[in-house]
Structures are given as structure tokens and as C-alpha cells.
Design a protein with these regions (language model features):
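Long alpha-helical HEAT/HEAT-like repeat alpha-solenoid scaffolds in very large eukaryotic proteins
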Residues: 129-132, 142, 147-168
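Amphipathic alpha-helical scaffolding segments comprising HEAT/armadillo-like alpha-solenoid repeats
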Residues: 39-51, 72-84, 102-114, 135-153, ...
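Short, structured interface segments
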Residues: 11-19, 125-148
């Protein structure tokens, strides 16, 4: 290398020693890159990463989120496991991945997370279910959904100095059928 008085072989050996045991990072990077462009083979590679509990939560969550772009029935069981993962980051990634499902299917799998212990997960579920009108659900479910939406609106309202908060609130209100309030937001 240019910064040491040693041969390239010395640098290569040092790098190999440093990165020993980290070969999985290459597979993860390749799967993520393929997932971002919906490349050939991305689905199975992402599904394998998402399903591996020994991997870091951030890797699994990213895999779930990207896997949703090309969701197949064969990976739906993996998503359901991800929604029950003990790590909220993995649950968050699984929720993001399931945004690709039609809203009527989304409600059925995400409803149990309306009361998730993690606020980040609950807020993501609120966005995923914003097209579901509480009035379309039985009274107990409607109350839970209304509470979730109130929590989401309060969270977005904390950042009203940001234009995207206004856009997010307007989108939610429009999804709920309140076009006049959406225009005001």
C-alpha cells in the first residue's frame, strides 16, 4: 500500500486477519444490494437473512423491509415470525415489508401489533393501517385503532415545523375520508 513501507502481500494478510470470520457481511451486502434493485435471487437471499435469529437485528429488519417489495406466499410465514420477534427493530422491519400487502390483508396480520410494547412499532403500524377506517371494524377493534391513530397524530404533531409532518397528517386524514381536514393540514 502507499501508506506503509511494506509489500501489498503484507497489507492483504493484515486485511484478511482483520476480517477473519466476517465473511457473512459480504453475503448480507450482496443480498441488500440485490434487494434494493429487485435483482434476480434477492428474494431467497433476503428471506434467509430475515429468518436467521443469530444475525444482528438491523440486518434482519433491513431484509424484511426489502423483501416486502416482492412478497411471495412462500415468505409470508417468515414475516409472521418477524412480527413476533423479541427485538422491536425486527418487528419494525417486518411491518415495513408487509406494506406491500393489500390493506384488507394487512389489517389481519398487523392488528395484534396495535398494542405493541414499542412505540416505533405502533407508529409504523398506524401508517400501515391508515387506510382502515375505525368505523369499518367492530367496536373494540375500532377503539384500539382510534387510539393508535391518536397516538400517531400526536407524534406527527410534535414536528409541525417540518413540511413532511403536514404532508403525513394530510395523507392520513385523506385516507380516513376527512378531505376538508386534510386540506387544512
Amino acid at each position: 500500500s502507499d501508506c506503509h513501507d511494506a509489500a501489498q502481500a503484507w497489507s492483504d494478510a493484515g486485511a484478511a486477519d482483520w476480517w477473519q470470520g466476517r465473511a457473512g457481511a459480504d453475503a448480507f451486502a450482496a443480498a441488500i444490494a440485490a434487494g434494493r434493485v429487485q435483482g434476480v435471487g434477492a428474494g431467497p437471499a433476503l428471506a434467509a437473512i430475515a429468518a436467521e435469529p443469530a444475525l444482528p437485528a438491523i440486518q434482519r429488519a433491513t431484509a424484511f423491509a426489502l423483501l416486502g417489495a416482492n412478497i411471495q406466499p412462500s415468505v409470508l410465514a417468515g414475516f409472521l415470525e418477524g412480527l413476533h420477534d423479541p427485538d422491536p427493530l425486527v418487528r419494525l422491519g417486518a411491518v415495513r415489508g408487509l406494506m406491500a400487502l393489500p390493506v384488507q390483508d394487512r389489517y389481519g396480520v398487523l392488528a395484534p401489533l396495535i398494542a405493541d410494547s414499542s412505540k416505533s412499532v405502533r407508529l409504523e403500524v398506524a401508517q400501515a393501517l391508515s387506510q382502515v377506517r375505525p368505523s369499518s371494524r367492530p367496536s373494540e377493534e375500532a377503539a384500539a385503532l382510534e387510539g393508535l391513530f391518536e397516538e400517531w397524530l400526536a407524534s406527527e404533531s410534535a414536528y409541525l415545523e417540518r413540511p413532511e409532518s403536514h404532508a403525513n397528517i394530510a395523507g392520513h386524514l385523506a385516507n380516513q375520508g376527512d378531505l376538508a381536514a386534510a386540506e387544512q393540514a
